[in-house]
């Protein structure tokens, strides 16, 4: 029988998503980047979304990520993942990092979830799968299944605007990104910035000024007028 776990504690980690990449490849018998390209990105016309983007885009088409990073010996990192685990252990393709995209393409994925797994008339995910992502909330943290959520009990620590309902799911990214889906109001909010370029160790302003939640707040306030 199953023995219940004791002293359960929450730890934020990338390891589970790195393992998910291995699971996808084991089941699909394909590299994850090729599997996603075949099953999602191409049919959804996500033409600006890719792992290892330098294989299909010009360097000038990709925003530089960082300069003078001590791990890259002062070179400009452009077109390759910034996350150290994905970069040095996963070859640039991982479940936790490495995907390059645009706001429009990212919004398509979140719209797919809001619409129950259907995009542009074609089903990509079952409604049951989407419901798991949209409704599950951890009992020991504010997070959902694979996504972050608003902290409805502490607006100061919440990654979302205070006006965001508890149904919202999404995530922020270290390099200055965030994307949120609001199934209650049928909204998608995507914000892509580049806070660690050119100075990798001077990137606190985005968080200090609370830019991402404040921009999301503007969206909600506009809807309330």
Regions found by a protein language model. Give the residues of each.
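Glycine-centered small-residue hotspots that permit tight backbone geometry or close packing
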Residues: 79, 173-176
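Short, gly/Ser/Thr-rich active-site loops of penicillin-recognizing serine hydrolases
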Residues: 115, 119, 128-129, 138-139, ...
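Glycine-rich, flexible loop segments associated with nucleotide phosphate handling
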Residues: 160-172, 205-214
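Short, well-ordered beta-strand elements
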Residues: 186-194, 199-203
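Short, surface-exposed beta-strand/loop micro-motifs that present aromatic residues
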Residues: 168, 175-188
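Short beta-strand segments enriched in hydrophobic/aromatic residues
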Residues: 24, 113, 183, 192-195
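Short, surface-exposed loop or secondary-structure junction motifs
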Residues: 1-167
């Amino acid at each position: 029988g199953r023995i219940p776990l004791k002293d359960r504690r929450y730890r934020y980690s990338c390891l589970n998503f790195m393992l998910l990449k291995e699971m996808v490849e084991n089941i699909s018998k394909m590299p994850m980047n090729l599997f996603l390209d075949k099953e999602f990105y191409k049919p959804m016309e996500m033409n600006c979304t890719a792992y290892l983007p330098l294989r299909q885009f010009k360097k000038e088409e990709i925003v530089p990520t960082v300069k003078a990073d001590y791990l890259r010996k002062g070179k400009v990192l452009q077109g390759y993942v910034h996350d150290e685990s994905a970069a040095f252990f996963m070859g640039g393709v991982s479940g936790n990092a490495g995907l390059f995209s645009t706001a429009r393409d990212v919004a398509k994925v979140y719209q797919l979830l809001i619409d129950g797994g259907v995009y542009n008339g074609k089903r990509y995910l079952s409604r049951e799968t989407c419901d798991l992502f949209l409704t599950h909330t951890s009992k020991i943290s504010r997070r959902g299944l694979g996504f972050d959520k608003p902290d409805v009990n502490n607006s100061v620590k919440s990654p979302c605007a205070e006006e965001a309902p508890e149904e919202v799911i999404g995530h922020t990214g270290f390099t200055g990104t965030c994307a949120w889906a609001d199934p209650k109001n049928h909204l998608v909010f995507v914000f892509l910035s580049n806070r660690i370029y050119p100075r990798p160790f001077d990137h606190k302003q985005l968080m200090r000024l609370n830019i991402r939640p404040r921009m999301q707040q503007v969206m909600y306030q506009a809807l309330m007028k």
